[in-house]
């Protein structure tokens, strides 16, 4: 590890199995995209960039396999593992009440029985959000020098039957699982003053989202907040996709800004995006602790405050019966000191006004995923500029200084359009610059593995390091054209977007 780093990614483990499934299986189903466009190999690649994806066996717990592979690494001492996070959404079984991390953790329990263990629900950016959580815990002194965090990402979309059989969303997803070890370096003793003097209990028989928003508003009024963390023990997919915290965030925003809610501002995409970027600027995600107690989520919120990056955090413990406890956490005089190496900065932003863009819905006696493809595409491409500027500018970094961009592989068509929004160049220079960046600074695998949801951020650097990526062309762009140089990258930007809607990013300096 670098001598002055606070947190570094030190090892990966992977599930490398599965059956390769090409587009012919969907072509044979006789499906159509919106507008009556027939589903075939050509239209799938043109719209999504996907040629093949991996499908796991029906009897595999692929997250366990990834963790086992990680622990083969002789540099990982399981007794030093202090935090285990399951960054996932659906996992192996959409009916599983969670926490989904309990299956991998059983493989670890004897080595680290006192570890903090939890799921984290934040859509596809879940890994990045988990990295930020670990960064906060390291900055605040919750994690100490030499402590190891393990983040397990596992999405078995096909086994879980996440979408209805005739939903074209099935086409884009692939199964995957990775386990990542992060080590805390320099330990910090936080200065400043921490306050947690406002709490409120709630109990409801109505919609828990409304109940939580009203209880928070009664406690905090219209005061701004930097983040909302919910320990969500409801144990139902419809309350974790999107994260319940994202829906609570927006319900609270409507109480804070009743005039804007009344005039329908939040139903107009461009206006609501600008309003959130200017007035809200807060993250929202769920956890589900293995041994649930209100004090656990409160300890995490405290760490965010003590990191110096955030001043006002709301924590909620939501019990299985929809009762719970809300706490306000605030701090003064804590200072965020950017480390020179390792993870140097992070940022997560949630726009809960778009929570319906990706959601799990009850359908008859079952539950299935539902996506507003146009809305997701708009948010992914139009929401990046403000978010990335907020991360890069305080670090005096510009996009052209990034050596390696690890971008979520939701849909290849999103990536060039996102970069067109982000790059600050004259109009006639944008497209050539984007093509150069895609070819020489970006790693791509969506054409071979599909959208692997939360696992993308772990899979891409792992496959780069082991030489599993190949030069190719996709939708008219050269891809993976500079792999040898990217293996030597010094400044790395990880960026992901997904349900919530949430965007989460972090910077690494090696």
Residue ranges and their predicted role:
Residues 139-177, 299-316:
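Flexible, glycine-rich active-site loops centered on histidine and acidic residues
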Residues 26, 97-105, 358-361, 419-422:
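Short, flexible, mixed-charge acidic loops at enzyme active sites
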Residues 1-57, 165-206, 210, 222, ...:
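Condensing-enzyme catalytic core mediating Claisen C-C bond formation in acyl metabolism
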Residues 14-16, 157-158, 235, 412:
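Structural signature of outer-membrane beta-barrel domains
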Residues 60, 64-67, 90-100, 111-112, ...:
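Claisen-condensing/thiolase-fold acyl-transfer catalytic domains that form or cleave C-C bonds
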Residues 78-91:
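Membrane helical hairpin/interfacial module
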Residues 100-104, 174, 178, 245:
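Amphipathic alpha-helical segments in well-structured domains
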